[in-house]
Amino acid sequence: MPIKLQKLPAAVRWGLAVLCAAVCGVLWAYYWRVFFGLDNRVSPLVVTLGCAAFLEVCLLAGYCVRRFAKGFAAKGAVCIFLCGLLFAFANPPLQTPDEADHYLRTYAISTGHFDFDASRTYPDDVAYLLEAFPGAWVNAHTSAGVGTDPDTGAEKAYNTAGYALKQYGKEGAVQSMADSFALYLAHDVRDSVPDPVSEPVSFLVIPFLPGAVGMALARLLGFGALGCLYGGRIVNLLAYTLLCALALAKAERYRPAFAAIMLLPMSLFMGASLSYDATLLGCYYLMLALLTRKEWNTQTAGIYTAACIFVNIAKPYLNLLWVLPIFLVAKREWYAKGCRPLWALGGFGGAMAVTLLTEWYGTAFRYNYPMIERQGGSTVNGGEQLAFVLRNPLRTIAAFWGTLGENDFFIGQLGLFGWKDLPISFLNLTGPLVLLLAALLAAAQPKRADAFPTRRRVGGAALLALVYAAGAMAAMYITYTPVGMVRIVGLQARYFLCVWLALLPALAVLLRKTIRPAITEEKAEAAITPLCACYAVFGAVLLFQHYFVGPVYVVYA
């Protein structure tokens, strides 16, 4: 007769969990050792103990969350922060898009420099860090050519694009991100002096303040350039976590969808970096969460307007679209002081004011910079591209559609990390499935009998998502893409995270009407956080694996 785990004493159940975690750690270490030849690089005992200890720590963290965190929002926030910590350390230095420039600007702010001076240089420690960890590390270390296959003697082309580890010959040493750490940590004994590093072409201050606080604290504790990087990442992650916690607390419906998006590996990858996308994504998620509230009071309207103004500091003009959802709140649902048009006008005026003020500040306090060329070179011209788009609307639509098709509509690139140079196939394949699971759980039977949000809210948010996606594509096409090019340059999956979140409630409504899931809202919310937290932990492990363990591309030169 089978034994039901629920009837076993809690101590026995947790004892079995500890045993299972240890066994899984041993098996995972064995897989790494066999498939990636890890025994030639690291002691088998170290690998085995490390994997087992890691899973035991994860189990302990899960127990603490279950035991001490009360409520959906609290549990979600703790999981976001803990899983984000894994990404902060699994992701090598400066490997988030544009993180090298973000690091330099954040470092300057952390030392009290709130202006922008191209003649100002950084300490040698910072220069050594940027030398050891170039942005787009995988692309920077990619090799291509023609070699000879030792088994057949035939010539064979090779290309290490997408591989962080490579090996020249079967007996050669494996080159990996670990070499960059060794290079940086050995800079004290090197005779060479690094090339001086000056301030980047980046003229924002406010979005980098959380990371700057983390760097300042790390410096007070005696850490160098590398420690400052991790300190900045952790405080940036804390800011992302607080915004997500507020969003989960304010959301009244579809909370499984919010938790799933917030715990996506791509969201945590950006949230636990020095990118201002950490707070940008948090504000997007917060604004969408507020749209699920049945009634809006002055506090709700104030939080929404503040978030709307903030996102326009980091990403101006396009984010003015976020003023419009205020009108999705019906008149009978509006309890804030002042009418909706007045709040919308205030949000629009505030957003335009901070945009113009940011542009003025970046120009007025900019010193010793030469003429700043357009990204993409002389072939990029916004005015000419806009005129080309207006003259050729059908061709532009074809270019947009072709770009989406080439990039799996960006929903199939939720596992594309680094500077778009490190694909993790498992996460690319399973990312859409996780979103589908989130929609299914968000379609659970609501606690209240009255259906809310209304079609007006859900449909309006979905329409906003589509317009925002089209606007993001148009902005990149006009400002970053050479005139007349048939594909858009620079689009990334992270730009569409808020789009997927805005579309999930609409998908949940369709699923509720078609398959009528029997699961209750309470059970759905109880299930989504541990499931997505486990997926996030696995994503962090895969990110670490692809940078430090394998797969290894063997080059036969």
Q: Predicted segments — roles?
A:
Residues 290-299, 321-352:
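Perimembrane helix-loop-helix junctions
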Residues 269-271, 300-316, 320-327, 350:
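Membrane-interface alpha helices of multi-pass inner-membrane proteins
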Residues 113-229:
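Interfacial juxtamembrane loops and adjacent helix segments
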Residues 13-17, 71, 223-226, 245-265:
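Transmembrane-helix signature of polytopic, membrane-embedded enzymes
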Residues 359-446, 554:
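Membrane-lumen/periplasm interface segments of multi-pass, membrane-embedded glycan/lipid transferases
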Residues 1-25, 29-30, 34-85, 342-348, ...:
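Start-transfer (signal-anchor) and selected internal transmembrane alpha helices
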Residues 23-50, 353-372, 518-557:
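Transmembrane helical bundles and short interhelical boundary loops of multi-pass, membrane-embedded
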Residues 273-280:
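Short acidic/glycine- and proline-prone juxtamembrane loop motifs at membrane-interface regions
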